[in-house]
Amino acid sequence: MEPTVKDVPEAGRYEARDGDRVLGLTAYRRQGDRVVFTHTEVDPDAEGTGVGSTLVRGALDDVRAHGLRAVPHCSFVRSWIDRHPDYADLVDPST
């Protein structure tokens, strides 16, 4: 089963969940119309299962849906965007 990705703005993060279990998270700060991604982590038991990719894709899809820009300070988010050029348009040009 593919995890669901949910924005948890009060915690400043997107979570990948399987029911009540958090499989991964990507932390962010909002700065105006920019979402600054600062850190991503995946539960060790879920590593290598695609949770990180599902998480970043879901977070960036949400950024796009809200007309925002992404600032990938997190190396995982940055490398994911580099491997998925169809998301490169979301990256704030000042980064």
Per-range role (PLM):
Residues 12-23:
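Conserved beta-hairpin
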Residues 15, 34-36:
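General beta-strand recognition
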Residues 61-95:
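C-terminal structural segments of small proteins and small subunits
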Residues 48-59:
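Conserved acetyl-CoA-binding loop-helix of GNAT-fold acetyltransferases
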Residues 21-29, 36:
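Conserved beta-strand in the GNAT
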Residues 8-10, 31:
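Structural motif
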Residues 1-7:
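Conserved N-terminal entry element of GNAT/NAT acetyltransferase domains
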Residues 41-47:
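A short, internal acetyl-CoA/4′-phosphopantetheine-binding micro-motif in the GNAT/acyltransferase core
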